[in-house]
Amino acid sequence: MKENDVVLRTVTKLVVFILLTFGFYVFFAGHNNPGGGFIGGLIFSSAFILMFLAFNVEEVLESLPIDFRILMIIGALVSSITAIMPTFFGKPFLSQYETTLTLPILGHIHVTTITLFELGILFSVVGVIVTVMLSLSGGRS
C-alpha cells in the first residue's frame, strides 16, 4: 500500500466502527433471530482484516492487545465447558439454562447459557479466521 492512502484509511475507520457495531448486534440477536456467534465472528474478523489491509499489519497488531491464537483457544474452552457443564448436574449435553435478572438501571435482563456458548464460538471464529489470514499474508500469526 502507498503511504498516502488517506481516503482508504479514513473510510476504514468509519467502516470498522460500523462492522463492529453490526457484529455486536448480530451476536446478541442470535438466540432469538438469525445470527449468533459464528456470523458475528465473521463480521468481527472482517473488521480486523480491513484494518490490516488499510494500515500496517505490525502497527495494528501492536495496538491491539489480542493474541488471536489464544483467543481461539479460549473460545473453544468456553464453548466446550458450557456444553459439558450440564452433564455434571444430570442434564443432557448442551442443555440451556435461562433466568431473568432485575438490575437497577437496566431493568429486566433475560440471561441464557447459550449466550456464553455463542461467545465461545465468536472467539473461536475470530481467532481462526484472523490467524489463518495473517499466516497466509506472511504476517505474524
UniProtKB/Swiss-Prot annotation:
It is a multi-pass membrane protein. Its main location: membrane. The chain crosses the membrane at residues 10-30, 35-55, 70-90, 114-134. The keyword Ion transport applies. GO terms for molecular function: antiporter activity. InterPro entries: CPA3_antiporter_subunitB, MnhB. Keywords: Antiport, Cell membrane, Ion transport, Membrane, Transmembrane, Transmembrane helix, Transport. NCBIfam families: PRK12573.1, PRK12574.1. This is Putative antiporter subunit mnhB2. It comes from Staphylococcus aureus (strain MRSA252). The gene is mnhB2.
